[in-house]
């Protein structure tokens, strides 16, 4: 078991958990495997101990561990009941609870029978699917966890950003490691775009071979445990072809940020000869492809973003896009080469918006498109993402959709080369890396 003093803090998530401490809802932490959910539970346990909660009031169960293998919901209930300290509030931590059949029965029993505060993690959205959410309706709060942001990446890898003065007197940001070695900010951002934000990369270092090995382990675990095995446990027979699953994963990874329909996935795989293994005749049905894509969404491997008609003020049912949860996983799947970097930085912006609490949609305005409409309960902004704003043609292409939106919400173009102009008729032009580093 990892000691929590060795763990890097992820304050944005920990503070959310602390904010819900000792409230009735079950705290459910969701996200792809190995994005840091178990570590977050450890940090919360340490916080409880630091604030006076006695160790005997805390019960931790990790259902990936051999210690708790094969347990039923009844077994969990009795295990906890035997360890309850009379007259004290208990703090219950259940890691990867979706592996237990009828887990919700035990959780509900604890809520009824004990004075307790419950924390749960799960690597599959099935944990909170409609089938089970009826049991916890209104009684749970979901904390959605993602791999490291660029700021967290810097922290986890021991980098510090400092402003230094250039020979001409201007200020520029540079990065220093623990040994005082200096790097250009772009160089470290390139490493983030190469290796991604899985926390485990910080343990093995920024070396391609070690990173590939770690990412291979994550990929295999997600596919085998969270998709193929889960389907067997559910008694469903939809996800039965590991080869088709991998081909769909590769297709979606290669087409992040591109408009994709379910029909186009199957047709493309057939037309490009990607299913010519002698076993499958013709294109897989749309129903089959949808089932495989849903399984990938439920395992938090990919996220779907919908299109929103800005003038009609309605979501469109056709041609959404998919983004991959970690750019390092994409590079592991497709190869570590500079491919489609425009969509790759778009991918990074999408997940940064989610981290900051925004809902994101693609904006449709006439025949044009805005990369992201980002909204919260009281805020809205339109965002375009491009590699460079140095070319007149690119500026026109990126600014035109924003200029055609007739409202007063903030409009921003994020790029790695914003040029000299900080704004164009009220549309901000910002450096993407500076935006990622901002609060």
Question: How would you name each of these model-derived features?
Answer:
Residues 36:
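Conserved glycine(s) of the Walker
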Residues 126-142, 154-159:
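Short regulatory helix/loop adjacent to the ATP-binding pocket of P-loop NTPases
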Residues 85-103:
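Conserved P-loop NTPase "ATPase switch" module shared by AAA+ and STAND
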Residues 117-123, 144:
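Structural recognition of the conserved hydrophobic beta-strand(s) that form the central parallel beta-sheet
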Residues 59-88:
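Short glycine-rich substrate-engagement loop in P-loop NTPases that contacts/grips substrate
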Residues 4-22:
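Pre-Walker A adenine-sensing motif
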Residues 2-7, 24, 30, 39, ...:
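A cross-kingdom feature that marks ATP-driven nucleic-acid transaction machinery
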Residues 7, 161-344, 351, 359-360:
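Interdomain hinge/linker elements that couple catalytic modules in large macromolecular machines
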């Amino acid at each position: 078991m990892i000691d929590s003093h060795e763990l890097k803090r992820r304050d944005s998530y920990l503070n959310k958990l602390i904010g819900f401490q000792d409230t009735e809802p079950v705290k459910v932490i969701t996200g792809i495997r190995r994005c840091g959910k178990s570590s977050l539970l450890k940090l919360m346990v340490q916080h409880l101990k630091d604030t006076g909660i006695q160790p005997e009031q805390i019960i931790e169960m990790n259902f990936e561990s051999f210690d708790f293998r094969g347990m039923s919901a009844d077994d969990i209930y009795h295990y906890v009941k035997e360890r309850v300290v009379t007259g004290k509030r208990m703090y219950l931590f259940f890691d990867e609870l979706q592996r237990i059949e009828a887990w919700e029965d035990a959780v509900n029993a604890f809520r009824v029978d004990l004075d307790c505060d419950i924390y749960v993690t799960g690597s599959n959205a099935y944990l909170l699917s409609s089938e089970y959410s009826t049991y916890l309706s209104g009684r749970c709060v979901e904390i959605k966890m993602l791999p490291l942001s660029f700021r967290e990446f810097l922290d986890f890898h021991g980098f510090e950003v400092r402003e230094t003065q250039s020979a001409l007197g201007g200020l520029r940001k540079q990065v220093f490691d623990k040994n005082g070695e200096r790097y250009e900010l772009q160089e470290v951002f390139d490493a983030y775009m190469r290796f991604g934000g899985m926390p485990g990369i910080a343990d093995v270092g920024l070396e391609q071979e070690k990173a590939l090995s770690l990412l291979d382990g994550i990929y295999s675990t997600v596919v085998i445990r969270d998709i193929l095995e889960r389907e067997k446990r559910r008694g469903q027979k939809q996800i039965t072809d590991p080869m088709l699953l991998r081909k769909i994963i590769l297709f979606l990874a290669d087409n992040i940020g591109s408009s994709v329909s379910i029909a186009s996935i199957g047709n493309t795989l057939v037309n490009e000869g990607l299913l010519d293994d002698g076993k499958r005749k013709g294109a897989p049905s749309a129903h089959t492809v949808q089932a495989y894509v849903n399984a990938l969404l439920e395992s938090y491997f990919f996220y779907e973003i919908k299109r929103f008609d800005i003038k009609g003020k309605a979501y469109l049912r056709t041609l959404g896009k998919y983004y991959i949860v970690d750019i390092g996983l994409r590079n592991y799947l497709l190869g570590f080469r500079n491919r489609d970097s425009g969509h790759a930085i778009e991918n990074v912006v999408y997940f940064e918006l989610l981290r900051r609490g925004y809902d994101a949609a693609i904006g449709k305005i006439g025949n044009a498109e805005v990369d992201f409409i980002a909204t919260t309960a009281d805020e809205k902004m339109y965002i375009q993402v491009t590699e460079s704003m140095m070319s007149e043609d690119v500026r026109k292409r990126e600014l035109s959709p924003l200029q055609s939106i007739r409202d007063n919400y903030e409009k921003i173009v994020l790029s790695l080369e914003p040029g000299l102009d900080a704004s164009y008729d009220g549309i901000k032009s910002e450096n993407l890396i500076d935006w990622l580093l901002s609060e």
